[in-house]
A protein has these predicted regions:
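Mixed-charge interfacial surface used for oligomerization/domain docking
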Residues: 14, 18, 23-24, 96, ...
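Structural motif
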Residues: 4, 85-87
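Short Gly/Thr/Asp-enriched flexible loops that form oxyanion-binding sites at enzyme active sites
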Residues: 90-118
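Short, conserved catalytic or adaptor-binding loops enriched in Gly and charged residues
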Residues: 17, 116-124
């Protein structure tokens, strides 16, 4: 039984890790200043994209989920023909239509996969599950890494699905935003009003960098620091302490909106 894992391009994992484990990336459409781009998680194109300055302030950027039909076609062409069981983990459904569209596409695929599978020379039935990761970015990457570990243990498909779904409620995330005002404006376009104008203004005026902590994609400020480096040190110390205490999976997932020079 060959099991495949599908994640969308919002999932933050190292490119080489994704290639090594044969992850299938479900693309996301980015619309920037009226121009459409397809994010397929290619590291070279992503680097060029950031260096172009299109994601800097002053540009209007939004992401759009692939449609049900687009996802259906990808599943039929790339998944049904290669795997016997597939798990698709999406960014949290509260922030995107990917989960909804992928679920509809899955239902259509499961009702019509026989011809495509036979043409590819694969015997037996095909089964699939779309799972709401309840995460964004690094949290989604952690779930994917843990899922690959479970796949490696060759669990029965029902047990695999149960373990993955149970793990989605056990992921905690720390976020260090550099610019609360910018994050507030981006969030407001999605209808998220969790960051008030006063908080964003004070954060910028007083050079306060908060640490946001929470389960999944939901979080609250738990610390306020006077600069970014102090916030990073606090989070790294906390992460190291949790590793020492023992984790449910042998992975920690880290996403950085930094250049390699800044990271080094």
């Amino acid at each position: 039984m060959r099991v495949g894992l599908i994640v969308d391009s919002a999932c933050d994992l190292p490119y080489e890790f994704s290639r090594k484990h044969d992850l299938f990336i479900l693309p996301v459409t980015a619309v920037i200043d009226g121009q459409t781009y397809i994010d397929e998680h290619d590291p070279v194109r992503t680097q060029e994209f950031y260096q172009s300055g299109l994601l800097q302030k002053g540009h209007h950027a939004e992401t759009q989920a692939f449609t049900e039909d687009q996802i259906h076609d990808l599943f039929m062409e790339k998944i049904v023909t290669q795997f016997d069981v597939a798990i698709c983990e999406t960014v949290t459904r509260s922030r995107s239509l990917i989960f909804e569209n992928a679920t509809k596409a899955m239902n259509s695929v499961l009702a019509n996969y026989e011809k495509a599978r036979a043409a590819a020379g694969r015997d037996g039935k095909f089964s699939m599950r779309v799972i709401d990761s309840k995460q964004i970015f690094a949290g989604q990457g952690l779930l994917a890494a843990h899922t690959l570990k479970l796949i490696g243990q060759k669990l029965p498909k029902n047990a695999l699905r149960h373990e993955v779904e149970a793990f989605t409620d056990k992921i905690y995330t720390c976020v260090i935003p550099r610019d609360l005002h910018y994050i507030r404006e981006r969030a407001r376009r999605r209808g998220d009003k969790s960051i008030s104008a006063v908080v964003a203004f004070l954060g910028k005026a007083l050079n306060i960098t908060p640490v946001i902590f929470g389960q999944g994609a939901e979080g609250q400020p738990v610390a306020k620091t006077r600069n970014f480096d102090v916030a990073v040190e606090k989070v790294m110390n906390y992460a190291a302490a949790r590793v020492d205490a023992g984790l449910l999976t042998p992975y920690v997932s880290l996403s950085c909106g930094l250049t390699w020079t800044e990271i080094e």
